[in-house]
């Protein structure tokens, strides 16, 4: 087999259905749209979500919850990602410099996922119990 011989598997691609091309085709005359009515005509169709005057689903069900504004400036960082930081001090600035978090982030929590391979000092960041134990086991500290 050569690159110029490549082709899709048999039955993987379907021929486009050509409608309105004579009665012998099986899809001539009305082209699968039936006779008369709104659906047979060009342009007009139903409004999205309209249920014929019945109260639509999106208005029947109650509203709930809200979007927390804290979530926009918060991030979670895996413990294993701290290995990417060149220095031994981990704070917001060093995480941004290492491209681990985006610039608008102001709150960070480190959670235990991955392995820490060097002792680090955590400054001004929240950590889980597992991370605290892992950092102290690696010879680092949390300030």
Curated annotation (Swiss-Prot):
Keyword list, A-Z: Ribonucleoprotein, Ribosomal protein, RNA-binding, rRNA-binding
Domain of life: Bacteria
Region annotation Disordered: where it falls in the sequence: 20-52
InterPro entries: Ribosomal_uL15 (IPR030878), Ribosomal_uL15/eL18 (IPR021131), Ribosomal_uL15/eL18_sf (IPR036227), Ribosomal_uL15_bac-type (IPR005749)
Family, as annotated: Belongs to the universal ribosomal protein uL15 family.
Entry's Gene Ontology molecular function annotations: rRNA binding; structural constituent of ribosome
Protein name: Large ribosomal subunit protein uL15
GO biological process: translation
Organism of this sequence: Coxiella burnetii (strain CbuK_Q154)
Subunit structure: Part of the 50S ribosomal subunit.
Gene3D superfamilies: 3.100.10.10
Classification via Pfam families: Ribosomal_L27A (PF00828)
GO cellular component, one term: cytosolic large ribosomal subunit
Reported function: Binds to the 23S rRNA.
Classification via NCBIfam families: rplO_bact
Biased composition (Basic residues): 30-39
